[in-house]
């Protein structure tokens, strides 16, 4: 079985997020942004967000006012990995989940589920590569 990996470019999407820009300033968040670097980027650029609660395993839930998806702008519509998870740990979590035997037959762009360091993780793949990693919204206890 071929090992599924995540690219550096995909980690930018997953961790910091993808934005639209006006005059070289980010104005709307399109997708991704599940790492601490997303919160740092939002703060740096004066974009409003709220972390409403933190699960026992460190997964944070909240909202991002500049997100294009309405559900991400609402209470607990967005999830971030634990604060101590850097891009390297997020990548390892995504690769771990994508390479679980139970996920080997999952089609492209469908959710693959697994657990890594007490966090339930969702990963997506496309053409043999990971194209998205995020914490599962409902962290099981």
Where are these regions (language model features)?
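N-terminal "domain-start" segment
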Residues: 1-111
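Active-site or metal-binding loop neighborhoods of secreted/extracellular toxin and effector enzymes
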Residues: 99-141
């Amino acid at each position: 079985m071929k090992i599924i990996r995540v690219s550096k470019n995909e980690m930018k999407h997953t961790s910091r997020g993808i934005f639209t820009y006006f005059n070289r300033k980010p104005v709307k968040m399109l997708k991704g942004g599940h790492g601490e670097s997303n919160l740092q980027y939002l703060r740096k650029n004066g974009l409003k967000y709220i972390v409403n609660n933190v699960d026992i395993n460190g997964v944070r839930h909240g909202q991002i006012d500049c997100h294009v998806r309405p559900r991400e702008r609402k209470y607990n519509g967005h999830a971030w990995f634990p604060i101590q998870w850097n891009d390297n740990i997020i990548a390892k979590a995504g690769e771990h989940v994508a390479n679980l035997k139970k996920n080997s037959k999952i089609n492209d762009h469908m959710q693959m589920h697994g657990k890594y360091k007490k966090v339930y993780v969702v990963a997506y793949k496309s053409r043999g590569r990971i194209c998205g990693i995020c914490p599962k919204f409902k962290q099981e206890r």
